[in-house]
UniProtKB/Swiss-Prot annotation:
InterPro entries on file: Ala_racemase, Ala_racemase/Decarboxylase_C, Ala_racemase_C, Ala_racemase_N, Ala_racemase_pyridoxalP-BS, PLP-binding_barrel
Enzyme kind, highest EC tier: isomerase
Entry protein name: Alanine racemase, catabolic
Cofactor(s) listed in the protein's UniProt record: pyridoxal 5'-phosphate
CDD domains: PLPDE_III_AR_proteobact
Active site: K33, Y253
Keyword flag Disulfide bond: no
UniProt keywords, alphabetically: Isomerase, Pyridoxal phosphate
UniProt-listed Enzyme Commission number(s): 5.1.1.1
Modified residues (N6-carboxylysine): K122
Binding positions for substrate per the UniProt entry: R129, M301
Function: Isomerizes L-alanine to D-alanine which is then oxidized to pyruvate by DadA.
Length: 357
């Protein structure tokens, strides 16, 4: 079997979830959309089922996968429904539903439902993706209450720059939300991962930890709470070939790298088809048999190359950590002008191996 694999530490996942609740004192929806950010939604939900207050996914298809796997906790559909016909399924499977636009509100008013919905009414407090504008929010709230189709309303919004702790935008959004929701009945959900960790004064009855669950910091600098996160995924593979090359020899596509001296080059079974970034630069950190090493040469579809010259004990079968406890995925992503969300979600071909269930 090809040695590339993603090790998933479910005990670390539970630790990170508990940290989110400890930091806020609020109930927490574990965000496991996009197949739990590449970690496997069903297995992550099963690992958290005994303690999670609920889960959040992007769409009904993701919710149905969880229900079919036996997950019975509340599941929030973060984008709501895309067609009015989905309302029947939402009721049948007891999903909670975000309502963020006029046509969704109208569809609920017209629907004949077997029982009332639990709705999360979303305000666009300044991110400008989806949600009712502040001046329209109270009217939408009143229409939902008057419809007779809704059992409970949670009022929510989403911060666009909470990962920038010195940026005033979060306080501006909070002020807009507070003004527009004043006097309206319902619980509040405002805090995403960076707000859970870095904005303790933001009120929330419910929080929505996402990237922090998987042990990746949303911040570019050290933070005392973020530093307590544990990485859930370790991406690793093995050396499958060793080349002894003299100085001046090209390595890989485009001859981007040439040996600087007599070097031992290890070929690792990992490439961009697995989700490792093709544009990783020469010198990118890897760990070889538990010691720091470096990538050299261009990443190809199924393989990449590392410098084994200063690792005399390394050779065929040596373990190479691409990201994980020794190579933080957030720091790695920043080197490529990317974000940890993208790297984690891009893993499609690598099998997962779970521990800590």
């Amino acid at each position: 079997m090809r040695p590339a694999r993603a090790l998933i530490d479910l005990q670390a996942l539970r630790h990170n979830y508990r940290l989110a609740r400890e930091a806020t004192g609020a109930r927490a929806l574990a965000v496991i959309k996009a197949d739990a950010y590449g970690h496997g939604a069903v297995r992550c939900a099963e690992a958290l089922a005994a303690e999670a207050d609920g889960f959040a996914v992007a769409c009904i298809e993701e919710g149905l996968e969880l229900r079919e796997a036996g997950i019975r906790q509340p599941i929030l559909l973060l984008e709501g429904f895309f067609e009015a016909s989905e309302l029947e399924l939402i009721v049948a499977h007891d999903f909670w539903c975000v309502v963020h636009c006029a046509w969704q509100l109208e569809a609920i008013e017209r629907a004949s439902l077997a029982r009332p919905l639990n709705v999360w009414l979303k305000m666009d407090s300044g991110m400008h993706r989806v949600g009712f504008f502040p001046e329209d929010f109270s009217a939408a709230h009143e229409r939902l209450r008057a419809s007779g189709k809704v059992a409970k309303i949670v009022m929510m919004s989403h911060f666009s720059r909470a990962d920038e702790l010195d940026c005033p935008r979060t306080e501006e959004q909070l002020a807009a939300f507070a003004a527009a929701s004043q006097g309206l009945e319902g619980e509040i959900s405002l805090r995403n991962s960076p707000a859970v960790l870095g904005w303790p004064k933001v009120p929330s009855d419910w929080v929505r930890p996402g990237i922090l669950l998987y042990g990746a910091t949303p911040f570019e600098r050290a933070h005392p709470l973020a530093d307590r996160l544990r990485p859930v995924m370790t991406l690793e593979s093995k050396v499958i070939s060793v080349r002894d090359l003299p100085a001046g020899e090209p390595v890989g596509y485009g001859a981007r790298y040439s040996t600087e001296r007599s070097q031992r080059i290890g070929v690792v079974a990992m490439g961009y088809a697995d989700g490792y970034p093709r544009h990783a630069a020469d010198g990118t950190l890897v760990f070889i048999d538990g010691k720091p090493g470096r990538l050299v040469g261009r990443v190809s579809m199924d393989m990449l190359t590392v410098d084994l010259t200063d690792h005399p004990q390394a050779g065929l079968g040596s373990r190479v950590e691409l990201w994980g406890p020794n190579v933080p995925v957030g720091a790695l992503a920043a080197q490529f002008g990317s974000i940890p969300y993208q790297l984690l979600c891009n893993l499609k071909r690598v099998p997962r191996v779970y521990s800590g269930a």
